């Protein structure tokens, strides 16, 4: 079966609808931009907002209480600590966390000392770290860092997902690697996709094992330079066609 779903960036709403309609499978191959690396696992993730409180005042006064400056100081230290605590080396697929400071806002203009500032942060981490465990670490680091700096910072969770790693003995993983070798004449590279995909929901909420494999470099996705090489698309098509034929027993 082939399924085309929407709203993957909106927490997998299309995949959730697919499951509500009763879709079941022994394996799902998701075509995300993995640079044609066969990804046997999917990162966990957390998305949250940090809000700093200060004290408003006239922009020409020497008063303290600038919430924007407070949050800037806080965030610089906080991110370094998150990078250290969520780094996983003792794995067949090691991964350091990916942290994106995607939004930072505060204040009204130069004549007013801002009393509030907030930022929104997305963290992807090794699948061995659950969303709950990651959240506990972030909560602790927010508390410790704020107390150390004498800052007032509030954490608001926006979204989270658990990752996974497929067993290397999975028969469909073996067949896909075999199909790759037969079509390209090379041994496939395997790894983790270091982003949330529909696989997170399908694996944990639908009980469907997932492999993520597709053309394109994720660095260009969601950017003004988004593109995919035609050569890579054709290679992926040939590999998946052979894989489907192997699974179905077809000779075509």
Stretches found by the model and what they are:
Residues 1-47, 51, 252:
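Acidic/histidine-rich catalytic neighborhood of metal-dependent amide-processing enzymes
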Residues 40, 47-252:
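Metal-dependent amide/peptide-bond hydrolase catalytic core
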């Amino acid at each position: 079966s082939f399924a085309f779903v929407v709203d993957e960036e909106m927490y997998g709403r299309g995949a959730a609808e697919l499951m509500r309609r009763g879709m079941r499978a022994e394996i799902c191959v998701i075509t995300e931009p993995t640079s044609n690396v066969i990804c046997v696992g999917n990162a966990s993730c957390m998305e949250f907002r940090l809000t700093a409180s200060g004290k408003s005042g006239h922009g020409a006064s020497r008063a303290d209480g600038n919430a924007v400056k407070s949050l800037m100081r806080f965030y610089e230290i906080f991110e370094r600590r998150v990078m250290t605590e969520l780094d996983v080396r003792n794995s067949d697929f090691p991964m350091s966390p990916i942290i994106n400071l995607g939004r930072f806002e505060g204040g009204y203009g130069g004549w007013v000392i801002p009393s509030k500032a907030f930022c929104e942060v997305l963290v992807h981490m090794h699948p061995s770290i659950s969303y709950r465990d990651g959240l506990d670490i972030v909560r602790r680091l927010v508390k410790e860092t704020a107390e150390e700096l004498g800052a007032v910072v509030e954490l608001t969770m926006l979204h989270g997902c658990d990752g996974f790693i497929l067993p290397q003995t999975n028969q469909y993983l073996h067949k896909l690697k075999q199909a790759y070798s037969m079509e390209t004449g090379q041994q496939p590279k395997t790894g983790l996709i270091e982003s949330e995909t529909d696989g997170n929901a399908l694996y944990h909420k639908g009980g469907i094992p997932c492999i993520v494999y597709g053309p394109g470099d994720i660095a260009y996705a969601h950017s003004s330079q988004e593109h995919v090489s035609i050569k890579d698309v054709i290679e992926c098509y040939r590999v998946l066609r052979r894989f489907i034929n192997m699974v179905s027993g077809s000779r075509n």
